[in-house]
Structures are given as C-alpha cells and as structure tokens.
Swiss-Prot record:
The keyword RNA-binding does not apply. The lineage of its organism: Bacteria, Bacillati, Bacillota, Bacilli, Bacillales. One of its GO terms (biological process) is symbiont-mediated killing of host cell. One of its GO terms (molecular function) is signaling receptor binding. The gene is cry1Aa. This is Pesticidal crystal protein Cry1Aa.
Amino acid sequence: MDNNPNINECIPYNCLSNPEVEVLGGERIETGYTPIDISLSLTQFLLSEFVPGAGFVLGLVDIIWGIFGPSQWDAFLVQIEQLINQRIEEFARNQAISRLEGLSNLYQIYAESFREWEADPTNPALREEMRIQFNDMNSALTTAIPLFAVQNYQVPLLSVYVQAANLHLSVLRDVSVFGQRWGFDAATINSRYNDLTRLIGNYTDYAVRWYNTGLERVWGPDSRDWVRYNQFRRELTLTVLDIVALFSNYDSRRYPIRTVSQLTREIYTNPVLENFDGSFRGMAQRIEQNIRQPHLMDILNRITIYTDVHRGFNYWSGHQITASPVGFSGPEFAFPLFGNAGNAAPPVLVSLTGLGIFRTLSSPLYRRIILGSGPNNQELFVLDGTEFSFASLTTNLPSTIYRQRGTVDSLDVIPPQDNSVPPRAGFSHRLSHVTMLSQAAGAVYTLRAPTFSWQHRSAEFNNIIPSSQITQIPLTKSTNLGSGTSVVKGPGFTGGDILRRTSPGQISTLRVNITAPLSQRYRVRIRYASTTNLQFHTSIDGRPINQGNFSATMSSGSNLQSGSFRTVGFTTPFNFSNGSSVFTLSAHVFNSGNEVYIDRIEFVPAEVTFEAEYDLERAQKAVNELFTSSNQIGLKTDVTDYHIDQVSNLVECLSDEFCLDEKQELSEKVKHAKRLSDERNLLQDPNFRGINRQLDRGWRGSTDITIQGGDDVFKENYVTLLGTFDECYPTYLYQKIDESKLKAYTRYQLRGYIEDSQDLEIYLIRYNAKHETVNVPGTGSLWPLSAQSPIGKCGEPNRCAPHLEWNPDLDCSCRDGEKCAHHSHHFSLDIDVGCTDLNEDLGVWVIFKIKTQDGHARLGNLEFLEEKPLVGEALARVKRAEKKWRDKREKLEWETNIVYKEAKESVDALFVNSQYDRLQADTNIAMIHAADKR
C-alpha cells in the first residue's frame, strides 16, 4: 500500500481471535476443544452415522459422553453465559454438571453392555443385562433432563439440555429397534416408541422456544449489540438448532434405514471491519438488513471484486455474484451489484474450485485522515484484502487472493467439523454468498464491509438420489418456484428455510440426479404443515406419478411447531426414466387464504429393508474391530485368522445392490487384515498348500493326512487327521519354527480352529513339551445339526445362508496346566522362549498327533505368533527352565563323553592302529562282544 503523508493515525486491527487458535503459515492449529467443535463433530456424526447399533452408541461415547469431564461441561455453560451476560448460580451450575457426569458414567456402562450383547445377542444373561441397563438409563435421563430446564436458567442451560435430549432419544430408539431381541414384550416396546415420538416434539419445541427467547434478549440498537446477536445466532445454530433439526430422524419406524439429511440454513461472520463491535451507534437494524432474506439455495460460482481508492488507499468497493440453481450447472444468473464498481485496479475474479470456498483470511483497514487544520477528519472503514481457500478431500488447491492475505480467519468462528484431517477436507461450512454493508456520512466516514454467508457442507449441490438410503431433500433446493410460492423463514427445527403457498398451484420444481439403476423404484414422502385439507400431486419430467388427499395439521393463525408438521407418503412406487430428472410438486383442492408449508421431500427406496442396513452396519463394525486404530495400521492381538475369515464372509454376503461401494471398501480392508495376519504368522505354509513337499521346511506328516478346500466352516484349506491302528505309529503332523524367527525372552502362542476332534494331542516343544489333549464334538459347523450345509449354485458352500450366531469373543485358550473346554473350537497354547542361539537352532516344534483308533481331527487357520515379552515371574520361570534344561544337557553330554571315551578305548584296544585295518593278535570274539556292549 502506498504511503500517504496525510495519515495521522493507523490503528492495527484487533481480530478478537480465539486465543486457543493460531494462524501459522496458512494452517489452522487447534490447541483447544470448544463446545462449537464438539457440536460440529456431533452434527457430522448424526448426519453420517445415523443408524441404530453399537457403532452409534459407541460413537456418542467417543464424541461426548465418554470424554467429557466437569471442565468440558462447564465450557458449554460459560459459552451462553457470556453471550447473554447471565451467570448461572453456583448451586444450579453444580447440580447440572453433577447430573451430566452421572449420565456420562451410566451411559458408558450402557454402551459397554450394548457392545457385549451385540457380540453375543442370544446370550440370556446379556439380554437381561441390556434390559437392566436400558431401564436405568431411561430412568436417569427422565429424571435429569427437567433439571436442565431450571426456572430463569433455561437459556444458559440450553446447549446441555439438547445434548441430554439427544442422548435420551437415541436410547429410546435403541429399545424401539432392539427391544424384542433384549426380551421386552411388545406392549413395553410400543410404549417406549410412543415416548420417543412424543419427546421428539417436546424436546424440539422447548429448544426452539428458548433459542428465540435468548436471541430476543441480546438484541440492541448498536453495532456492538448486533455482534453479540449474530454470535448468539451463529453459535447456538451450531450447538442447538442443527442437532435439533435431526431429532425427527430418531423415529425408528419412519426411518428404519440410513437416512441422509441436509442443513441448508446459513450462518454469518461479522462484516470485516476495524472497531466494528463498538463504534457505530444505532446501526444494528441497518446491519441486519444486510443479511440475505429467505431464498432458494443456489451454488456460488464466481465473485467479481472491484477496487476503489480513497486518498491513496485501495479497498474492496463492491462485487457481483454469479450463481446457478442446485441440481445442474446452468443456466447461471447474476445478482445485482453490491457496493460500487470501482476502477482503481482491474477486477479480481474468484471462481469456484473444488468443493467451494471453506475459508477466508481478511485484512480490514482503518484510517483516520486529516484533511487539513480543524475538525475535518475523515475515517475510512474498508477491507484491504482477502484470501479465499478452496476445499478438497485430496489435494491442496491454490487459493485466490484479492490484493493481500489478512489475519481475520473465518475458521476462528466457524471451525472444521473434523480436526483429524486438514481443514480443507474437514471443513464444516462453505461460502454461499457475500453481501455488502455500505455506508457514507459525507466528510465524516466511509464504510464498505463485505459480509460473508456460510452454508453447512451437508447441503450438496446435485440433489443426488441413490438406491441405498432414504434421501431427504429440502424444498429450498428447488430449481424454480411456482407462481404464488414463496420462501419463508424456517421455524428453527427444519435446518433451513421452507416454502409457503396460500392458493392452489405448483409449489416448485426440483432437479434431481439418480445414481442408482433406473430400475430402482422409490416412494415419495412429503413433510408439510397446513391449515387445510389438500391434495398433493407429483410428476417426473411432466409424467404424473402420484396423487393423494391429506389432512390439515394445524389451526389458522397458529405458530409453526414440531407437531404442526407431518410426514406423509404415497403407497405407489415409481422409477425415474432419466438419470437427471425434474420432480414437480403441486398442491390442489383447497381454498385460497389457507396456508401450506413444505419443508422437504423424501425419496424412500421401495425394496430396501432394515435387514440390509443392519447387515452393513454389523459388517462395518466387525471390520473396524479387527484393527488397533482407525487407520488400519495393525491388527488387534486377539483377532485370529479364523475371525478374519468369518468377517470376510460377513462382507461377501452384503447386498451388491444396496451397498456395493461400501462392500468393496470393506473387502479391501479385510484383505489388508489378512495380509497383516500372514505377516505376523511364523508358521510356514499356514494354509496347507502341501505336506512333505520339502525336507527342511513346511509341514511334515503322515501319508494319510488329507488337505481339503474351504467349506461352510473353513474359508480356506484345512487338514483332516485320522486315527491309527498301531499306537507305535501314530498319525502326526509337525513343523519346526526356526530359531532365527524367535526373539529372546518372549512368549509365543499357537492357535487355530478345530471343527471337530477326538484324542487330538497338541505339543509345543523347546526346553520341554507343552501338551494338551483336545476333544471337540462335531458341532463346529455354523449350520444347525438338523440341516444340510447349504450349497451355492456352482456347488460351493453358501456362507450367506441363515446360520447360527458366532461369538468372536469366546475365550477358549489353553494355558499352562489347563485342559481346553470340550466345546471350544478355538484353541491356543503358549510357550516361552528364553535366550536364543542360532548355532544350537533349538527352535520350537509344533506337533499334532493322534495315537488311538477312534481319534480324528479337522483343523485349520493355524497361527504361531509373538504374544508378549516376558517380565516378572514369567521371565524368572523361563530362565529357571532354561537353566534346568542346560544343566540336564551338560550332564548328559558329560555322561555321554565318559561312555564314549570308555567305548572308544575298548574299540581301540582291538586294533593295532588308528586306521582300524588290522586286529591285535590276541583279540578274540569275547573281547569284540565286550566292546560292542560299551
């Protein structure tokens, strides 16, 4: 910027940034976890993982209920206290935090019980435990939530009220979905479902009511008041209204499968000005008028920024927005010019790239300019420059800079929803619009301040309709409004604005894009409120689809509340004819002057059942639990090779039509798990490609051992060992683990899966033999004994047919001195290794043996792997065993040497020389027999 001699004062901008956030080299570095961060993560979770099951339960634990302590809950209270300038009394504060702590502790117990039950859902004790835990959790929440609505503190307690309400609805949904499997009777389940639907409305209306009360409370006439008003609106949209907008999805009978919602509401960062929070009297209303009125959602394509100059200072003087409707890229339309089209520099074009603009770094400029002697001072409040950063899930995209990059970071007030990835991928909002606060007061001051509007990233651009989920599309994503239809402010719980009609006619047209096969059939549902009975008509590309009569939901003049809206549908399914289609909704057969409000439409796959969704969720959970972390770096130690094969079966049995992409992704993860399992397995040829193939490596065994391909029990090869008629010649299978593969002072584990066995002896030998005899009845098949193993169309085992539940957490290890339980198909045997010596190459011998006529065994998925380093008594014990073995070996060597020496002397005495080619003259047959006995 050019220097100007008329400058008298230059005040650096105080960005009022969050002290827990710094901007370093363009990257946002988090040093704290605020209520807004938590709420954004929760909203992301609810938008992406809204499926009942242990995954959802444990997700709530991970995000909030398992990590929060008193200080984190207090931060939620402090956030609103500061906004409304009201302190919660110490008693009410302590009571609220204590209740939240109690709920957190109780829910962690509930979540663990849920996890255990889901792993073994037919276990009577676990079913009873779930009934107990649900009743305790439901009772605690029913008692606690009214305490978060304490008189005079409803607003400052609002965000924790919503967190508790969300938890309560999730628990009630659990019993609605799983209650029968837990053992509750139908009457109890229906009663709890009725509680769920009633409380969805109650909790929603309460939250919206007190949000509006708080918002009205912080309104005032000056810019300082507007800043607080806008902050309250923005932050409680994130911590309260966004979560409440998803409450209706907890209705498990209306949304039995994965449901995708979208938040189309906008939030606003403050006009980027120096001294904005306190320098402008009576301007709050003027600033609020700068906020965009309710409108259809559009896609921001370009911002053309103009530059003006005032006494040597260049600044953002105006801009023009070019956008397009949702659903397709054209035709574009331009908004009227905001501000004025200055020509002090060429216009700067900011074009949409990647997933949109997720961040702005702005540089406000304030100058007090002395025009001469006397009081003729003029103040300049403008924007000197902005950097626009573009979102991308994969790569860093170059930003666009208007003049210069600043320090006022939009991420400080609208942070990412996922801090585990770069902000460009974890962003929560994208820039949706820019208006201009413009004011001039003659020779007193000049003000030009762009105001940025932001939309949640869940509001996608294309109105995509897949086959595998219920798709909710807000009607504000329509392409065109019918004549007489208007966009009005939403009631607060719809996640955005809504449409309104007061006379019969077309409501809107919506362009949708179908990613499913065109043969996929759907049913349409409409969420509406109306003061009159009416008839809805739907059509696709001008082709009539559905027509139905529906009733009034509210009285004329009533406020819109949760109960005012009803979700209704048509029974006749249909399919789309084109991948890109226009859906039209109309309302007819009612008198003008009535009010009809439309929130959203829903496309429900006609054939999708909850079972398919449950299978996917179960498979995802099973795959994720194979690994030690979410990045799949390592396998959990207790995950067996057999377990991985069973998880692979779960994935292979998923529906291609319902979740092909997810199935392919899970399949790759299972293959990775299998590779990790092979890498840690010290056995050679664990999948039995052959026996006696090589003399010095791999498996050696009896000639009557057979290798068989996978069946309904084993996914891969397994071996069958038969009995023997001669105990001196047992059936055997063995392999030696080379010394070079072993670590000193480490415990190793042999484990595998036995389909059935009788008199199977298992040995691990190093310093001595570890030995177990295992008898497993022939019920190892996943199939009921009364049924024949299912066969696929090509003769292969059908692993996707209904089968008995398999419990991956069954503990059936054989420890020192123990016998395996007779019904444990999983076995494991430990052995401790002391000092290693490559010269001795002692190794570990793995041996399976049957020495009875009735003996037999079928086994596979064998593993020999490192378990843990030896410490303490185990270390001392192996050292004693090693010393005892060495002492015994040395004694045997000493005794052997003596015997050898005596024998050699006896033999030497028989011959005349060391070549042993001629006997002594006196050597006789008795002397030879005596030497032979040596």
